[in-house]
Amino acid sequence: MSEHAETHNIIIAGVERDLRLFEVKPGVKIAILNILGDTELVQAAARDLAKALHDFRAEVLVTAEAKSIPLAHALSVAMGLPY
């Protein structure tokens, strides 16, 4: 792995991350965000999402894919909802 990998900077809910870019085909690069284990980012995102969703009358939270489970769990705690 290169010591100077190309990255894309993002800020989510005030938390800054530099996402490594991966070339998926010649000339096409994508940034990968993996929230598994990133508790600082998950908690901040859940806090801001809970505020944004405050006026919705949700009864339960559902997520479709394993990597989003930490965010769904943190959001359920912040909103007091089952998931």
Which residues does each predicted region cover?
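Active-site-facing substrate-recognition patch
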Residues: M1-R57
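Glycine-rich, small/polar surface segments that engage phosphate groups of diverse ligands
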Residues: V60-Y83
